[in-house]
């Protein structure tokens, strides 16, 4: 619901468009990384940037998956440019995982998020689904060669551990920009 402010008279804090969310996600990732790498780290600023980034990430994921589902329902997805864009390898995943492995990823501490073993590459479409079904309070990250890598725990619908996935936030945004052109 993009423009709900008319209902309450208050300005909406919801993202207005996919393009805006992509822009904001890229920017907040940079702000987060800079705050985290300061000496001493600026945890307040990093936390604020992270919260803002998550709102934009969720908006992007929901909009792209909704558009995909609409195209599937209309019979216009198979063979489309959107399908091609979503089939690009864009993240990594380690599966199956145990609860202990998911807990260890968090226990490693902020900035030390890693997959517990050899990963397989996953498509942007699969990554979007992993992001959608992530533990919202169970994520980590690392800064690697000035890149912000987001690491997430994912469960199956029955709440059993499914996987741990990771992606480079900047690369994710670049590929979502391409996919958004074909929604």
Which residue ranges define each predicted feature?
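Acidic, Ser/Thr/Gly/Pro-rich intrinsically disordered interaction regions
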Residues: 2-55, 62, 69-183
